[in-house]
Swiss-Prot record:
DNA-dependent RNA polymerase catalyzes the transcription of DNA into RNA using the four ribonucleoside triphosphates as substrates. The lineage of its organism: Bacteria, Pseudomonadati, Pseudomonadota, Gammaproteobacteria, Aeromonadales. SMART domains: RPOLA_N. Disulfide bonds: none annotated. This is DNA-directed RNA polymerase subunit beta'. Zn(2+) 1 binds at C70, C72, C85, C88. Coiled coil: none annotated. The RNAP catalytic core consists of 2 alpha, 1 beta, 1 beta' and 1 omega subunit. When a sigma factor is associated with the core the holoenzyme is formed, which can initiate transcription. Its EC number is 2.7.7.6. The gene is rpoC. HAMAP family: RNApol_bact_RpoC.
Length: 1434
């Protein structure tokens, strides 16, 4: 018996495998899978419910319907296993073979497989070099195709219509062979000589020069080579045998009432079998050709429908007019096999319930209702009951649990102790959406959740539900405890900031207890310590906010981690002293009570009057930001354990004092400022005045609208300012009898000020005025809502308000779907990005500098390099070789402080993009694991983490495109630069000339003006437009507030670089120019006509201004032999006359800039999606393809010809540019490769091609960050870099070298690199390539793994391509492994896979292990069965 069980166990053992290969099935292979031919369309007998013989459910072919029982009932039970019944022919075995055994149908005529025919590009068409239309005409019997031309003048695969065929027959008889239908295509495919074709095509490729021909040949060549390498034969794309799916995978279930529920596949198979049998009969009867042909066509159509219904023609529908679900539909889409059953499954041992607050829980606990726990832990309880001897059998244990006996609860307590459970809240947008807790049993039916983890789950208690899962195995429990416990997930993986941060009530409570109040009860007391402070407060002798002196003992952490005690008397408040009781040892008191920085005058006053110490108490209370910083500091200094305890204590304390504070919202808290009436009246008067101006025609409608909106916007600002001043400050007399100002104790103000709830904007709507509202299309309604919510709205105001509210709801719904889809694409592209090695040894990296926009540092260097590994030694500024930080060092907080102290302003750090690991990434290039704070571990799935970090805040982003108009566009037209910092000027990429006033005039496009401080750090940077006049010199010192540059924002000047006399060319009045006189000033100016406006005589002319000297000779531009001449584009205005003298740096002409109207700026989610999809912008910036000198060639109707002549004498580059594009360059100007020639949004593809990998990475990272920064979301750059690395996975082959690659084909970079290393080692020529940027969808679909790609999108296309190419899936990524049902090669699975591979390698080395041959195994099995057949088992 034991042997038998052993044998049964052995049966289920799976094979070890490393990769999965997909290919075409040959007819013989299909027959070898099959257990018999299905000959009849019958399914089951409607009376006996037994399957019909030879039918679709036949037991003889597919196996018995009942376990170990043949159909007629002659053989039953295990002892007859393997016997084949002589009456009904059914093998006695388990029913589950009906899920595995396949059948087949012998087709009477071959049929084409629709996937290889219709899936674009058509594989059959590509191989035969015929168009899809022609092939379809042959297949569906509309025309003949020549198969063997013989000695005739026909050609192989030539199409012949019916008449042509008959004519040819008359002329040549049976000299030639032509057929129609799939037989014809089959014969053509059989006739292909793959090797010969490949050879001729490679020769063709070497000879041809035409691009289209190359492309076509390359495609065909790749397909042919794929066939050759994979061992597939082209004729297998035409089927002569059709496999039949095992019946249990297409079940037929009898419903009550004698009807059946059936899978659509059965209908489709029945159709095929019926037509096939009819065709066989017709062929036997030798029916007329036309009937046979029709039947063959119908057979082809029914096979098409079975494989992929609806791919060709109309889909076959069932009885209910719904298209039938074919085999292809079974695997694709959200409901298909991949996404429904393989990537996500429902699991056992889980339950869900509503959540409520558990304010008394510790951070690692959750409250689990007893009822749920009993159900979830049932098997454990049964086991315990049995092992204790309290129940004899499982049945008895079950009864006890059902009766809920007292002993059961005790056992449940034991079972649950230290057994973590997982809590999950949908939608799980990032990994913190599932965390582990230790359950504590509670009464009631709701799960209790710790308030601090709500932020990570994005949960609230308005009816949210959560699911509980029980990790069963020891390993699972271990992982839950070590990796997923809520106490181990204090930092957010997206930004490395704490995510366990108190919010709402807790913040309010802590804020309230750390506030100081003037003249509170007990002001001026001196207390012995925090304990006494608490006693005094509890006894009611002092108020929580009283300013007192307290003796505080701090423990300061030294460099060697030892603690030093320091006690001193501090000026503080009672509340802060009480709060210091929960500070972990090693954190200084200043973290919760920052000492006030006194001015010199205040210090002198304090020295003179010591009793004034009350005023030196800091008036800063703990807000949300400070609390977050407090926790962060605690984590970095004290470590995990202290932080967890501290966070819990903060929460309890916060709740306690929030309750005591009694902060509430009353209508009287919304104080309306007295100034509101006057401000509104003044605004209304201004609006009336503008209306009068409009009616008298002084301003246009547009100007009136914009001005009105400006007026109301500023009125709103003034009202809200008055309101906030009113709310936020109050004056009071202190114990010394002096009046002092303090922050208000108004409840509404406190809630907003602490960061607990609400914001200034919301208070403004309550107590100020609601302000301007937008229409649904985004334009602003010019009459604002002057009322606020306290005063109440009238009907019209209420109606206007509904627009915004409704649009908000609609947006949210859209946003959620779009954001989810973006996350899905990101996960899919990055899923195989895992840390696979410790160090790849590269010296490459990205240069990091602080991000500066205008005068503001948006992101300091410290935040950008923290947690990165240095790629190059950081040299101390001002020295030649003093190394601050050596390369390959991880920059932690201390080292970043060091860099800041030494004012380093650029660091080269390693990055995922420059990592040289072939598959995955190395730990050093990634840097710190943000959620843990140390160097990332091997096996960390950084790709998925990156995708989640970018996708999770997606729902917070807006969906809208911003219309910049009205109030906002004022800022756009800047005309000067005022510096905000004191320092020295530095110009970068500047070209300039000195004008007559000896000021610098900028003559280059990409000039940046930066302000450096005395340490050489960049403080701010500004872009200078062409033609701006500088008030300062390079290197000059400036102080904050100085204006350093001016320009005219509305026109674009053309600046002279030399002095001379003007000479006009081709400037003929009425032909190329016209004169206009200004009505106000009476001055006349010359305006150049646009090409379209000129008479035909002037079309070819190019109006030019030349500079000549006194003798009329051309003046040269200094340093070149190019004459100084300036071509004038259309619409240019010239204010000087012919022959006028000009100096250096003067403007000879001005080009009016169209005020760029209300441009739509794509913002929010769509912008992020565009960047990651690497979409080409509508009108991208035009970049210089090579470095050289600009000139303009012959113009065509709507375009200008731009010519760049390289300085080093290479080939000239020409490009046609539409006339309406505003060019930034003039004739004779020198440009560098990649410089912007015409403004517009830059295309990432151009940046990569012309500037390289590093700039494109920076561009995408900065653009994505801009969107998130606007919403206040912090994401580390690393995550974006990981995604960009995946977008740069592919390259285009420029020259193949000695590899077997084809020029112009797109291949994974890793594959080329591996091949090249091999070639270089052998001394051969490696291939050269250039990187290409792919959007995330395209990158996901073109990954090496076909399983991963097929489960993402376009399943049919991916699988078709993979099958034809005979692709192997190496199962490297996470998705593939989930689908084949293995541990993923990341995290703990990384180690498992390594161990597996090593074990196998060791087994392979230990040769000489006796291997059992198949025959021996069979013999052993037979012996076993005979042995076990001797006894019968009940």
């Amino acid at each position: 018996m034991k042997d038998l069980l052993k044998f049964l166990k052995a049966q289920t053992k799976t094979e070890e495998f490393d990769s999965i290969k997909i290919g075409l099935a040959s007819p013989d292979m299909i027959r070898s899978w099959s257990f018999g031919e299905v000959k009849k369309p019958e399914t089951i007998n409607y009376r006996t419910f037994k399957p019909e013989r030879d039918g679709l459910f036949c037991a003889r072919i597919f196996g018995p319907v009942k376990d170990y029982e043949c159909l007629c009932g002659k053989y039953k039970r295990l002892k007859h296993r393997g016997v084949i019944c002589e009456k009904c022919g059914v093998e006695v075995t388990q029913t589950k073979v009906r899920r595995e055994r396949m059948g087949h149908i012998e087709l009477a005529s071959p049929t084409a497989h629709i996937w290889f025919l219709k899936s674009l590009p058509s594989r059959i068409g590509l191989l035969l070099d015929m168009t899809l239309r022609d092939i379809e005409r042959v297949l569906y019997f509309e025309s003949y195709v020549v198969i063997e031309p013989g000695m005739t003048n026909l050609e192989r695969s030539q199409m012949l219509s019916e008449e042509n065929y008959l004519d040819a027959l008359e002329e040549w008889g049976d000299e030639f062979d032509a057929k129609m239908g799939a037989e014809a295509i089959l014969a053509l495919l059989r006739a292909i000589d793959l090797e010969g074709e490949v050879k001729t095509m490679r020769e063709e490729l070497d000879q041809t020069n035409s691009e289209t021909k190359r492309k076509k040949t390359t495609k065909r060549l790749k397909l042919m080579e794929a066939f050759l390498q994979s061992g597939n034969k082209p004729e297998w794309m035409i089927m002569t045998v059709l496999p039949v799916l095992p019946p249990d995978l297409r079940p037929l279930v009898p419903l009550d009432g004698g009807r059946f529920a059936t899978s659509d596949l059965n209908d489709l198979y029945r159709r095929v079998i019926n037509r096939n049998n009819r065709l066989k009969r017709l062929l036997d009867l030798a029916a007329p050709d036309i009937i046979v042909r029709n039947e063959k066509r119908m057979l082809q159509e029914s096979v098409d429908a079975l494989l992929d219904n609806g791919r060709r023609g109309r889909a076959i529908t069932g009885s209910n007019k719904r298209p039938l679900k074919s085999l292809a539909d079974m695997i694709k889409g959200k409901q298909g096999r991949f996404r429904q059953n393989l990537l996500g499954k429902r699991v056992d041992y889980s339950g869900r319930s509503v959540i409520t607050v558990g304010p008394t829980l510790r951070l690692h606990q959750c409250g689990l209702p007893k009822k749920m726990a009993l159900e979830l832990f049932k098997p454990f309880i049964y086991g315990k009951l049995e092992s204790r001897g309290l129940a004899t059998t499982i049945k008895a244990a079950k009864k006890m649990v059902e009766r809920e006996e007292a002993v059961v609860w005790d056992i449940l307590d034991e079972v649950i102790r230290e057994h973590p459970v997982l809590l999950n809240r949908a939608p799980t947008l990032h990994r913190l959406g599932i965390q582990a807790f230790e359950p504590t049993l509670i009464e009631g039916k709701a799960i209790q959740l710790h308030p601090l983890v709500c932020a990570a789950y994005n949960a609230d208690f308005d009816g949210d539900q959560m699911a509980v899962h029980v990790p069963l195995t020891l390993e699972a429990q271990l992982e839950a405890r070590a990796l997923m416990m809520s106490t181990n997930n204090i930092l957010s993986p997206a930004s490395g900031e704490p995510i366990i941060v108190p919010s709402q009530d807790v913040v309010l409570g802590l804020y309230y207890m750390t506030r100081a109040r003037i003249n509170a009860k007990g002001e001026g007391m001196v207390l012995a310590g925090p304990k006494e402070a608490e006693k005094v407060y509890r006894a009611g002798l002092a108020d929580l906010h009283a300013r007192v002196k307290v003796r505080i003992t701090e423990y300061l952490r030294q460099a060697d981690d030892s603690l030093v005690e320091r006690t001193e008397l501090k000026n503080t408040t009672v509340g802060r002293a009480i709060l210091s009781l929960i500070l972990p040892k090693g954190m200084e008191y200043a973290l919760i009570d920052e000492p006030k920085v006194l001015t010199a005058a205040e210090q002198a006053d304090l020295d003179a009057n010591p009793q004034n110490w009350i005023k030196s108490v800091s008036n800063k209370a703990l807000g949300k930001k400070l609390i977050s910083r407090l926790l962060n500091t605690c984590y970095r200094k004290q470590g995990l354990k202290d932080t967890v305890i501290f966070a819990d204590q903060l929460m309890y304390t916060g709740f306690h004092y929030a309750a005591l504070s009694g902060a509430s919202v009353g209508i009287d808290d919304m104080v309306i400022p007295d100034a509101k009436k006057d401000i509104i009246a003044a605004a209304e008067a201004e609006v009336a005045e503008i209306q009068d101006q409009f009616l008298s025609g002084l301003v246009t409608a547009g100007e009136r609208y914009n001005k009105v909106i400006d007026i109301w916007a500023s009125a709103n600002e003034r009202v809200s300012k008055a309101m906030m001043e009113n709310l936020s400050k109050e004056r009071d007399v202190n114990s010394l009898g002096e009046e002092e100002e303090q922050a208000s104790f108004n409840s509404i103000f406190m809630m907003a000020d602490s960061g607990a709830r609400g914001s200034a904007a919301q208070i403004r709507q309550l107590a100020g005025m609601r302000g301007l509202m937008a229409k649904p299309d985004g334009s602003i309604i010019e009459t604002p809502i002057v009322a606020n919510f306290r005063e109440g709205l009238n009907v019209l105001q209420y109606f206007i308000s509904t627009h915004g509210a409704r649009k908000g709801l609609a947006d949210t719904a859209l946003k959620t779907a779009n954001s989810g889809y973006l996350t899905r694409r990101l996960v899919d592209v990055a899923q195989d990005m895992v840390i696979t090695e410790d160090d790849c040894g590269t010296v490459e990296g990205l240069w990091m500098t602080p991000l500066i926009e205008g005068g503001d540092v948006v992101e300091p260097l410290r935040e950008r390099v923290l947690g990165r590994v240095v790629a190059d030694d950081v040299i101390k500024p001002g020295t030649e070789d003093e190394i601050l930080v050596a390369r390959n060092t991880l920059l932690d907080e201390q080292l970043c402080d060091l860099l800041e102290r030494n004012s380093v302003d650029r660091v080269k750090v390693r990055s995922a993009i420059t990592c040289e690991t072939d598959f995955g990434n190395c730990a050093h290039c990634y840097g710190r694991d943000l959620a843990r704070g140390h160097l990332v571990n091997k096996g960390e799935a950084v790709g998925v983490i990156a995708a989640q970090s970018i996708g999770e805040p997606g729902t917070q982003l807006t969906m809208r495109t911003f219309h910049i108009g009205g109030a906002a566009s004022r800022a756009a037209a800047e005309s000067s630069i005022q510096v905000k910092n004191t320092g020295s000027i530095k110009l970068q990429n500047a070209k300039f000339v000195h004008n007559s006033d000896d000021k610098l005039v900028i003559t280059s496009r990409s000039t940046e003006l930066t302000i450096m401080d005395d340490m050489g750090r960049t403080k701010e940077s500004h872009k200078l437009p062409y033609g701006s006049v500088l008030e300062v010199k390079d290197g000059q010192a400036v102080s904050a507030g100085d204006t350093v540059a001016n320009w005219d924002p509305h026109t674009h000047p053309i600046i002279t670089e030399v002095a001379g006399r003007l000479q006009f060319e081709h400037m003929i009045d009425g032909v190329t120019i016209t004169r206009q006189t200004d009505e106000l000033t009476g001055l006349s100016s010359i305006v150049v006509l646009d090409v379209n406006e000129r008479p035909s005589a002037g079309k070819e002319m190019r109006p030019t201004v030349k500079l000549v000297d006194q003798n009329g000779k051309d003046v040269m531009i200094p340093g070149t032999d190019v004459a100084a001449q300036y071509f004038l584009p259309g619409k240019a205005i010239v204010n000087l006359e012919d022959g006028a003298n000009v100096g250096v740096g003067d403007a000879v002409a001005r080009i009016p800039q169209e005020s760029s109207g209300t441009k739509d700026i794509t913002g929010g989610l769509p912008r992020v999606a565009d960047l990651f999809e690497a979409r080409q912008p509508k009108e991208p910036a035009i970049l210089a393809e090579i470095s050289g000198t600009i000139s303009f060639g012959k113009e065509t109707k709507g375009k200008r010809r731009l010519v760049i002549t390289p300085t080093d004498g290479g080939d000239v580059y020409e490009e046609m540019i539409p006339k309406w594009r505003n060019l930034n360059v003039f004739e004779g100007e020198k440009v560098e490769k990649g410089e912007v020639l015409a403004d517009g949004p830059e295309s990432a593809h151009d940046i990569l091609r012309l500037r390289g990998i590093s700039p494109v990475a920076n561009y995408i990272a900065n653009e994505v960050q801009d969107v998130y920064r606007l919403q206040g979301v912090k994401i580390n750059d690393k995550h974006i870099e990981v995604i960009v690395r995946q977008m740069l996975r592919k390259c285009e082959i420029l020259s193949a070298g000695d590899t077997d690659l084809i020029e112009g084909e797109q291949v994974e970079v890793a594959r080329v690199k591996i091949a090249n290393r091999k070639l270089v080692a052998e001394g051969k020529t490696p291939a050269t390539f250039r990187h290409i940027l792919m959007g995330i969808t395209k990158a996901s679909l073109s990954t090496e793994s076909f399983i991963s790609a097929a489960s993402f999108q376009e399943t049919t296309r991916v699988l078709t391509e993979a099958a034809v190419g005979g692709k192997r899936d190496e199962l490297r990524g996470l998705k593939e492994n989930v689908i084949v049902g293995r541990l993923i090669p990341a995290g703990t699975g990384f180690a498992y896979h390594h161990a597996r591979i090593n074990q196998r390698a060791a087994a392979a080395r230990a040769v000489g292990v006796p291997q059992v041959t198949a025959d021996e195994a069979q013999q052993n099995l037979a012996d076993l069965l005979n042995a076990s057949g001797s006894f019968d088992e009940e």
